[in-house]
């Protein structure tokens, strides 16, 4: 009886506390997602669509990260190495930092200011991130 009770508790816990698996069958972004505004390092507001058009026809990896995210910081050396070994691949970094100042400090602290960086000034919950079911960082999209 104890085993059955334990199994039921484990099953309920796994069901209640499990994360939603993102839908992976999306092949195109919605108009709302592409219209999402992001801020470049020089303060210019662009849509996600404008950023993607700059890399049209090329292999592009979008790295979703934040300076407060330990796993994101640990992944930076690997993405740097991947970038160096594969110059044909282009990288864009989308930050989910809570403030513009945190983002800018993170770029300098982790020495990635020379990369193509953008910040979601509307925060985590925005049309683009909602469309891709972003629920954790780091996340990479190819």
Predicted regions and their residues:
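Conserved redox-active cysteine motifs that mediate thiol-disulfide chemistry
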Residues: 64-81
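Bacterial Sec-dependent N-terminal signal peptides
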Residues: 1-24
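Short pre-active-site segment immediately N-terminal to redox-active cysteine/selenocysteine motifs
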Residues: 58-60, 64-68, 136
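N-terminal "domain-start" segment that seeds a small globular fold
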Residues: 20-54, 117
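Thiol-based oxidoreductase modules, predominantly thioredoxin-like and allied folds used
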Residues: 88-102, 112-124
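Short, internal strand/loop/helix patches
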Residues: 108-141
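Short alpha-helix adjacent to the SAM-binding motif of class I
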Residues: 81, 102-109
């Amino acid at each position: 009886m104890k085993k059955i009770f334990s199994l039921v508790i484990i099953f309920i816990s796994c069901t209640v506390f499990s994360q939603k698996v993102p839908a992976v069958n999306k092949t195109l972004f919605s108009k709302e997602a592409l219209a999402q505004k992001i801020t470049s390092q020089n303060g210019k507001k662009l849509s996600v669509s404008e950023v993607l058009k700059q890399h049209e026809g090329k292999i592009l990896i979008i790295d979703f990260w934040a300076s407060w995210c330990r796993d994101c910081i640990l992944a930076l050396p690997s993405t740097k190495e991947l970038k160096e070994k594969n110059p044909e691949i282009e990288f864009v970094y989308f930050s989910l930092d809570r403030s513009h100042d945190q983002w800018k400090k993170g770029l300098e602290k982790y020495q990635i200011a020379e990369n193509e960086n953008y910040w979601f000034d509307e925060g985590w919950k925005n049309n683009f991130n909602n469309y891709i079911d972003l629920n954790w960082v780091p996340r990479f999209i190819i």
